[in-house]
Amino acid sequence: MIKKVAAKPLSWLERIFFIDFIKGLRITLKNALRKTITTHYPYEKITPPKRFRGYFAHKVVDGTEPQPAFQEWVNRYNILVEYGKSRCVVCLRCKRACPVPQLFEIEGKKLPNGKRVVSVFNMNMLLCTYCGFCVDACPVDCLYQTDIHENASYTRKDAVLTLEILEQIGRDWQRRREREPDRIWIDDEQRMKLWGENNVKLPKPEEV
């Protein structure tokens, strides 16, 4: 059985000044006087936190590599070290650690002098979850994440980060890092210490 409830009749004062209407808008009126907190993107930019997991980059060889650990990995995979080029030693640890390994396309090339270099390093960001597992797995601190979060593109092809793009993002990040020292990820030495005690079976260079 439906119970009918009689509405309370409005007084003449409530009818004239729309008091019920004003009561309904009190939340709106209250917040209308508060300072706005909305960031009007893209006209306004935000500053990501220190541990923000943004677009990926490659650190290049610039003389700041943690020694002797970096040289040990270079000798292990017989890598040719070139100043200004990626630190990657083609160990494939990033691909093995990734929940979606299909996003990585990594190839090494053997030079006539017997040394090896990374020739292909593509990352399909359409498949990436930005979990950072690949960054943690990198033994030479080559792969890392920056504060870049504007990664929209018009085509699927533009969503693939090539080796050249990763190196360029890395150079730009290092230059900005000098001006913004507070926004720094885990230090190179700390990561190398973590991997120094890891007894994971490594693949042979010819298997990479």
Curated annotation (Swiss-Prot):
Keyword Transferase: no
Subcellular location: Cell inner membrane
Entry-linked PROSITE patterns: 4FE4S_FER_1, 4FE4S_FER_2
EC numbers, comma separated: 7.1.1.-
Family as reported in the entry's similarity comment: Belongs to the complex I 23 kDa subunit family.
PANTHER family named among the record's database cross-references: NADH DEHYDROGENASE UBIQUINONE IRON-SULFUR PROTEIN 8, MITOCHONDRIAL, NADH-QUINONE OXIDOREDUCTASE SUBUNIT I 2
Any Gene Ontology CC annotation: plasma membrane
Annotated positions binding [4Fe-4S] cluster 1: 88, 91, 94, 138
UniProt remark on cofactor binding: Binds 2 [4Fe-4S] clusters per subunit.
Chief subcellular location: membrane
GO MF terms held by the record: 4 iron, 4 sulfur cluster binding; iron ion binding; NADH:ubiquinone reductase (non-electrogenic) activity; quinone binding
Gene3D superfamilies registered for this protein in UniProt: 3.30.70.3270
UniProt function note: NDH-1 shuttles electrons from NADH, via FMN and iron-sulfur (Fe-S) centers, to quinones in the respiratory chain. The immediate electron acceptor for the enzyme in this species is believed to be ubiquinone. Couples the redox reaction to proton translocation (for every two electrons transferred, four hydrogen ions are translocated across the cytoplasmic membrane), and thus conserves the redox energy in a proton gradient.
Gene behind the chain: nuoI2
Catalysed reactions, as listed in the record: a quinone + NADH + 5 H(+)(in) = a quinol + NAD(+) + 4 H(+)(out)
4Fe-4S ferredoxin-type domain residues: 79-109, 119-148
Subunit structure and binding partners: NDH-1 is composed of 14 different subunits. Subunits NuoA, H, J, K, L, M, N constitute the membrane sector of the complex.
Stated name of the protein: NADH-quinone oxidoreductase subunit I 2
Topology term for the membrane: Peripheral membrane protein
Chain positions recorded as [4Fe-4S] cluster 2 binding sites: 98, 128, 131, 134
Species annotation: Aquifex aeolicus (strain VF5)
Keywords, in A-Z order: 4Fe-4S, Cell inner membrane, Cell membrane, Iron, Iron-sulfur, Membrane, Metal-binding, NAD, Quinone, Repeat, Translocase, Ubiquinone
InterPro entries: 4Fe4S_Fe-S-bd, 4Fe4S_Fe_S_CS, NADH_quinone_OxRdtase_chainI
Cofactor(s) this protein requires: [4Fe-4S] cluster
